[in-house]
A protein has these predicted regions:
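Short solvent-exposed strand-capping/beta-turn motif centered on an Asx-Ser/Thr pair
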Residues: 430-436, 485
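Intrinsically disordered, low-complexity Pro/Gly/Ser/Thr-rich segments with frequent PxxP/GP/PP motifs
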Residues: 453-485
Length: 521
């Protein structure tokens, strides 16, 4: 109350009242994409066939590596800790090659995005490929866009139930095949298939197939565009990869505006008319449910189906194709300026067409090879190629023989009855070839050093002979002895050297020989 006892009234409004409160998440509006036809749609069919063919058929490819190695061309052998890719075999200690492949994939993604935008999202992303496949099934079972909208709005009937059960059944089969193909990369495919269907496979195989069946069905059939919009981080990241010379799917409003659904009537009335007849064909085919005419949007995956739809309309009305096209921001801005667009004036269709012929004027800018080959993309390509070349060189020069030595912790040394000092070592020798090998182990840099195997009673020798199994690691324990009078310090550095008897490979590892401090030469 104020001084006079009157109640004070406040001029304030509840900004978060029940009446105006907005939900945290926008409710999803179901999208019914129309079947598109054209160059980019055919290209997407081709990419889908290639990528799905590679995924489903690769586990069945055979590659002869000899009698001692698996003959599956691509295999992730978790039990034996090996990764096979045709003639390449990666061991656990060589995981840096896998890291190199991941770096190459990342740089390659940057390269593609900086040149042709989100082409990965629009053509080869697994989510896009499987959604395309699921949509093809939906269109085959329920019909094109109008038929699906009508079916969705219709009350439940026997016909609707049959179509829905058929569609979702096929989707589940696709999900099952997707999960089934995945596990075939981790074991011999024919053997695992037999064990799987005879219920003799490991429980993890059934669990993995079940999880991937469910995720494929949910992501590809039910969530679709929501995965790209809300779950995938790439739409947010790709903005940093684009510049004014990157190709993106663009609505060229410098020739499309002003829109008119009745162009002839508008022209007769003396109004300016652009090429866009506002038919919304570009919206009808979009799997993300956006209108490309609103400009660049986070949801756009640059699948270019709107280009096909618009080109078809332009053909029907006798206009040039390319109202929606791949374009760079620089080209777009230049053409907008040519059309007279500014902050205060709209585009003038008459400025971009020859008054006599009605064709587009020659001064318009179009995409050229300079949009792709520029300093930024060259740097990306050189980095990508450099990593690839370095990995190929490393693979071609790597040794197929490796050795490691671990000194015994307790006791560090033993004083023998003849006055010599003995140290124990755990030796691992890796035979990284798919054939048996015989190797010799020697000491380098240890004066008068001799060796014996811990599991034999043979006399000490300057070298030891070992037979290695193909593609395997041999572990053994050796005793190294030396005359302390020949050693200058309490710790002497030396090397274990291993050499194949055939002479084609050698390897060595560093070690230390210890003796007591009180021992005097």
């Amino acid at each position: 109350m104020d001084a006079n006892g009157a109640t004070e009234r406040f001029n304030v409004e509840a900004v978060n009242s029940q009446k105006i409160r907005q939900p945290l998440y926008a409710p999803r509006k179901k999208i019914f994409p129309k079947r598109a036809t054209g160059t980019f749609r055919r290209f997407k069919w081709l990419i889908m066939a290639i990528t799905l063919g590679i995924y489903y058929l690769t586990p069945f490819l055979r590659f002869d590596r000899g009698p001692f190695s698996p003959n599956q061309a691509v295999l992730v052998d978790l039990a034996n800790r090996r990764f096979y890719f045709f003639f390449i075999e990666i061991w656990p200690q060589e995981f840096y090659y896998v890291a190199g492949l991941l770096v190459m994939a990342g740089v390659g993604l940057f390269l593609v995005t900086s040149t042709i935008g989100r082409a990965w999202c629009g053509y080869t992303c697994p989510q896009t490929v499987w959604v395309d496949l699921f949509l093809a099934v939906e269109q085959a079972v329920e019909g094109d866009r109008n038929a699906r909208i009508k079916l969705n709005a219709a009350p439940w009937s026997l016909g609707k139930i049959v179509k829905r059960v058929t569609k979702h059944g096929i989707w589940l089969v696709i999900g099952f095949l997707t999960g089934g193909a995945w596990i075939l990369y981790f074991a011999d495919a024919p053997t695992l298939l037999h064990d799987f269907f005879t219920l003799h496979a490991a429980s993890v195989a059934y669990f993995t197939v079940g999880i991937l069946t469910a995720t494929t069905y949910v992501f590809g059939g039910l969530m679709r565009e929501q995965v790209c919009t809300y779950m995938c981080p790439w739409p947010r990241i790709q903005a940093a990869m684009l510049d004014e010379n990157s190709l993106t799917v663009t609505y060229n409003d410098w020739r499309g505006e002003p829109r008119s659904r009745h162009a002839k009537k508008a022209v007769a009335e003396g109004r300016k008319v652009g090429d866009c007849i506002d038919c919304s064909a570009c919206v009808a085919v979009c799997p993300m449910g956006i209108d490309i005419r609103d400009g660049q949007q986070l949801e756009c995956i640059t699948c270019a189906l709107c280009i096909d739809a618009c080109d078809g309309v332009m053909d029907k009305i006798g206009r040039e194709r390319g109202l929606i096209s791949y374009a760079t921001l620089n080209d777009y801005n230049a053409n907008m300026a040519l059309a007279g667009a500014s902050e205060t004036t709209a585009v003038d269709p008459a400025r971009i067409r020859d008054g006599a012929t009605g064709k587009l004027v020659p001064g318009l800018r179009h995409t050229t090879w300079r949009s792709i080959i520029r300093p930024r993309t060259i740097v990306y390509f050189l980095v990508w190629a450099g990593i690839g070349i370095a990995m190929l060189v490393a693979l071609s020069l790597r040794s197929t023989l490796e050795i490691s030595a671990l000194h015994d912790r307790n006791p560090q040394y033993v004083l023998l009855s003849d006055g010599s000092i003995r140290n124990g070592f755990k030796i691992k020798i890796s035979n990284m070839r798919a054939e048996p090998r015989t190797v010799t182990l020697t000491l380098e840099g240890l004066p008068g050093g001799l060796m014996t195997r811990a599991d034999t009673v043979e006399p000490p020798s300057s070298s030891l002979l070992f037979k290695l199994q193909p593609d395997a690691v041999m572990e053994t324990r050796v005793f190294v002895r030396a005359d302390p009078s020949a050693l200058e310090s309490t710790v002497t550095d030396f090397d274990f050297a291993v050499r194949a008897v055939s002479g084609e490979a050698t390897a060595s590892t560093h070690a230390k020989f210890e003796k007591p401090k009180e021992q005097r030469p």
